[in-house]
Amino acid sequence: MSRILITGSIAYDVLLSYDGSFADALKGQALDQLSVSFFSPHFRRHHGGTGTNIAWNLRLLGGDPLLVGTVGTDGGSYCALLEERGISTKYIEQRKDSVTATAIIGTDNGERQVAFFHPGADALGSWPASGNVNLQDDREDVAWAVVGPRNPVLMMEAVRWCGSQGISLLFDPGQLIIGLSVDELRSSITMSRGVICNEYEWGILSERTGMQTKDVLKTAEFLIVTLGDKGVALHTKKGTEEIPACSADTVVNPTGAGDAFRAGLLFGLEKKWDRTDCCRLGAAMGSKVVEIEGTQLDSLDLEEVWEQVRMTYGKELSK
């Protein structure tokens, strides 16, 4: 089995829930005088981060993630947990001069979110392309790579390294669309086989770069825009396919569903499935994560996932 190179944030998530509506609370507020406070009776602290969320969900599917990231002084226990889960920490840098990145995410009763992200140690990290710990040692095992949101300098180093190594790249800029320059965004898209973002992020990415779907597809093989409970739009040179979402039994918190989708997508890409089936598995994985409080499933019933895909789409996936 080939490996998937994953670079993204390694973080702790603080999840807060607001029983009202952010939209209602902000009605009539003058933005230049904005001062609001939300009472949150629900508090949870979880292991999170885009990189680790994707890696763990991929591992549950039976994939072999190669995780690259940075943790801080409080990251030792997180690394120990990853090792217990069978995820190598060989390329996780541990800094002694900062804390691990932390995300604080508030969700209202309509699943709207307000988030703050402190990069912590990730802002001080480095890309392991030289020295005693060198990604070149594992290059031959890597089939695909995903570059997700983290320190923008390291994102660009990752994109360039993957390009120099001829590694198939999935570009996932996420919240860092506004942290990368227009030239960096355009060059990253040009060097990628696939681009993925949610509907809101695609609007910003398109506006900033001036690129429409057809422009992305001049160089990339596909563009995936996730649409929440409406499913996924898969854009290829053949056209656009709307793939419905998989229904969850219950929605506890939507945080992490996108990362779970990416894990399913990458699992399929490594298996050389067609893009539609990759997205279907991603949708099934996302539906599992929204049923829990947190972004990383404790366990996964693979037969249940395959059955959910079959029931939703009428298609058996290869195992």
Residue ranges and their predicted role:
Residues 37-46, 244-256:
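Short pre-catalytic strand/loop immediately N-terminal to key active-site residues, enriched for Gly-Thr
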Residues 218-222, 227-229, 246-319:
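Conserved post-catalytic alpha-helical subdomain immediately downstream of the catalytic base
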Residues 1-66, 77, 319:
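Glycine-rich phosphate/adenosyl-contacting loop at the front of the ribokinase-like
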Residues 59, 163, 270:
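Gly/Ala-rich phosphate-binding loop of Rossmann-like dinucleotide-binding domains
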Residues 48, 61, 98-100, 228:
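Short, basic and Ser/Thr-rich N-terminal targeting/leader segments
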Residues 1-20, 43, 80-98, 105-242, ...:
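Ribokinase/PfkB-type carbohydrate-kinase core domain
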